């Protein structure tokens, strides 16, 4: 056990060890992304099909100024604010719930057919803060557990670890989270004296699998939630990026079971770090759930940067509150990249019956299945000897499953890099298939 000894200003020693720090720091989910970053730094010429970052070609610093100017004009002309108030809005601390909740509500009505009152919106520092606030609020005592599909987004797993919230897995299928297994897990929790507070779900092009739920499955999931009195935490980061649009759970919800988590990282600007949560549920004696989330946010980040909010607001204002309109070029590129990735997988690996992959109709991710172990050792070998990076799927299972799958991200690369990246991946897989079986 390594112990670090520090001397404080009084000459007293302070001993620190991992055993005396929060247990989440040694969990594989917390450290999984560090490995990818280390490999990217160590092998800079390797083509990364690991990072789920948005396309960069259209980034332009001038847009930041245009967006802020548009928001300031909105404050002056639409809201009739004096110049001193406009200046204060950007430079001072802002309200905890955010300064653009009304504009987000208009965007939700325009793009998602969601009727959200501004007071039910809390603007957060990315969707990650929204997840933390929700789980911290719902985790009241040792009985409380969260359900989530297996595999699931590591950010959700991380938020659960930081809030000491146990996560119970729900089976996933090619049609997304399985509502019938959700029923079984609810029954199991009841038998064990546990209280399921919510089920996390990404109905559209889930990270990491790329799968989506069809319309009947969405209705069934809402039925299960209503019948059992649980919340559904709907994460819709990739909903715009498909060949067809299905209604969000929130737009279908008639019983108040859906808490909607949104992010502008993929549709607005990742560097702004602006997300939000729509929590319009009533809390007995406490107003809206959004009000309770706001209390915690006030002690965590105080408020989301008003300047960052102004950037996002300007983009909404200049695109008639439609991120579908604002992302028309990006949507086309992601569709192109996805179809190219699938066709390249077929070209390079289609003759190998033991290798397969799913065929999402949108989003950023494709899942490849192979008949051998995909672990961090193989990832390092791929970077070093084949010049390609991917994400081993076991990271999204907490290291407990998924050892024969990998995730490819199609969002950031050019067509040329996709072709070369898949070619390198195919060379790795073909070579690995020749290794002697254990």
From Swiss-Prot:
Signal sequence range: none
E.C. no: 2.6.1.103
Record pathway: Antibiotic biosynthesis; vancomycin biosynthesis
Reactions catalysed, as given in the entry: (S)-3,5-dihydroxyphenylglycine + 2-oxoglutarate = 2-(3,5-dihydroxyphenyl)-2-oxoacetate + L-glutamate
Pfam families, per the entry: Aminotran_1_2
Presence of the UniProt keyword Transferase in the record: yes
GO-annotated molecular function: pyridoxal phosphate binding; transaminase activity
Sequence positions bearing N6-(pyridoxal phosphate)lysine: 266
Protein name as catalogued: (S)-3,5-dihydroxyphenylglycine transaminase
